[in-house]
Amino acid sequence: MRPADSVATSLEHSSSRRALLAGAGVAGTLAAIPTLRRLFRLGEANASPSQAQDIRILQLVLQLEYTQVAFYEQALRDANLEGELRDFADIALGHERQHLAAIRKALGAKAGPKPTFDFGPRTKSPEAFVKAAIDLEDTAVAAYNGQATNLTKATLAAAAEIVSVEARHAAWVRAVAGQVAAPDPVDEPITAAQAARGLRLIGLKTQ
């Protein structure tokens, strides 16, 4: 079965929204990929889509989702968020936890260990949180978009349903901060180097 399938099954049981992905199970073997940069390099290769490549891209997405979950958890604990900004962080965290759980289930033993993080001051104040949240959500949207042409049709459809939620997060936190919610007419994909650097700057340390 396709990697997209078990993600859908997991989300059906964890959320009232419809499933993000369609199917169940990940077959075959895949050597562990040691660095985030190698994961993102996949997007630059533009190889023909395959189930094996879907698995590697899901591993990429897993690092993004781990980072988002850890970021929102720490900010809710330490940043003194209030009002709609706290509501945003709480709801975004719920979404990211569902994404993370579904992707982990799809990957099974191929998911790899949880990374470590050091967000520094980014999770210590509302002002720092807003800037970092925008950067993180924009990075997520651009990274998903950067992998679009490398995915099989089923997994691409699943990723599209996730990336649309990430884009809503980016718009929402901008609106709460008094910024233009959608400042650009298009969302451009980013390169492997840009994506890896973005996550490192935000706080991803090891995987």
Say what each PLM segment does:
Residues R2-S15, A22-Q207:
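All-alpha RGS (Regulator of G-protein Signaling) helical domain and cognate RGS-like helical scaffolds
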